[in-house]
């Protein structure tokens, strides 16, 4: 349940005056190199490949710090010279898991011609050094010939439809983007459908037919086609010539028709622009959408005009609206619940507004200056994995003499935020924040920030999303993790050695914790440990799965031991050890302390929906005043509702003695 606006405002006011935080945190782009990148999620992390490096493989546990495993081939395979005799390298890999193996579809081509071919290589395991790792080339899949074909066999991308069939999109210029059906077993073109479907094409004379790099993904029963438009690959001294951008459309069938948000067919020149040049980030394109546990992400390259002027990659969330259209979220800079405002979708009412500026004290070294004019707007699409009450930690600078005001709209709900002077412009110490209460949905959320001119102004750096915990953390609200997944019933599953991340957990909203319980099924041994800050951080709560009591519906309740006085804002890591197979976890439940009043029962359990009032604090944490409770001095059995991930309750009758 929501805690109510009064409760959230209470926490916000308490922090606004006294907040200190465990550590300053400034985002920093990792500048991972890559061109035409492809990524895949596997159980222990991520794999990444890109163009012109003989299918060089990188792996990462967190999609931020990457390990180079070198090239997976020594050069162009011999078969490829039959179709592209003058090819000079391997382009545009696409990593996809099908038929029990990891396959990399790649292409060879003669630049500027249609003498091109697509082939693939495969391995059972994608982690070097593990059992089953080792690449085998399977040769030719599809080809085109210059002077004969009006499309080009490059830039392959594989997708699985809702019926279990596999398809491969490809193409560049000419007739644009094509689609063929694949045989899942062989990996080659299917024998039961030899059609080459034209699914996207630039038709205007001005465009020159410049469309390539298709990527397909299914979401909520519809198919999304992302393509790259315009001029690519000019970098270094020629970076200003690059006009590359990312467009998309969607369809109800994998074979199309794909239409943009305005209803125009992509096969007739349509397409909605998702990403194009902004600030230092030139030519964001050549990307691929992929499924990452509980979110869809998009990896693409760009050229850094303020740095080395060469290619690097960004990984972003794709954020879907309620009517299932895609918007592009933040580049991933190491955290899931933070948004750098300079990476938002910027609408300028006048030229010179919303200027991306540099500062050594700004997160990632950049911020938005001149947030001045009514009608200018910053839109931040965000994927949120746990629905509920949040505080938006609004990091700003106001070098004026009086407070500025901004309009903050969260999923259509507007509020006005006051931003007092901070003493200087362009500097952003961690104390220069205000807290904005908001209720967020699970899935796509859309935050819009606008100046509300009153003659005073404020610059913006970053928004952090802090989740307020009343009595429950749902396991399936995790931000990411290793050796974890969501089942078809949306339940959280974890294997031995796995962990899940819960960022920015506000623990000050918990008061007088009596017991902590974890809902579990499908496991009777091993331990779940909740840790502070990292996967091997200090243990906060330990839940021994061998000590459980049956709740019903297959669920058991495990009583956890640990620090019942936990406070502050924490990143919590849920870690698993000693588990056989896979454990299904429900909610982590914080039960209020059971106390007595005059040796007699005094009333009802404290409700998770009760509001709270702020209490002054000098400790740097948020202090919450005791909640008022109703009491009638009668022995009345109260019912404590335990809920599984589907919201079904397993009621356990208990008796409370409440002190007030």
Where do the model's predicted regions map?
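Short, surface-exposed beta-strand/strand-loop-strand elements in extracellular ectodomains
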Residues: 403-414, 526-535
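Extracellular carbohydrate recognition and processing domains
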Residues: 273, 412-442, 535-569
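C-terminal outer-membrane/trafficking sorting elements
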Residues: 612-660
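Short proline/glycine-enriched turn/loop motifs at strand-loop junctions of beta-rich domains
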Residues: 400-401, 522-525, 636-638
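Bacterial Sec-dependent N-terminal signal peptides
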Residues: 1-23
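Extracellular beta-rich ligand/substrate-recognition surface
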Residues: 359-377, 385, 424-428, 487-501, ...
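Carbohydrate-active catalytic/glycan-binding domains of CAZyme proteins
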Residues: 21-355, 359, 393, 462-529, ...
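Exposed beta-strand face motif in extracellular beta-rich ectodomains
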Residues: 390, 443-445, 568-570, 657
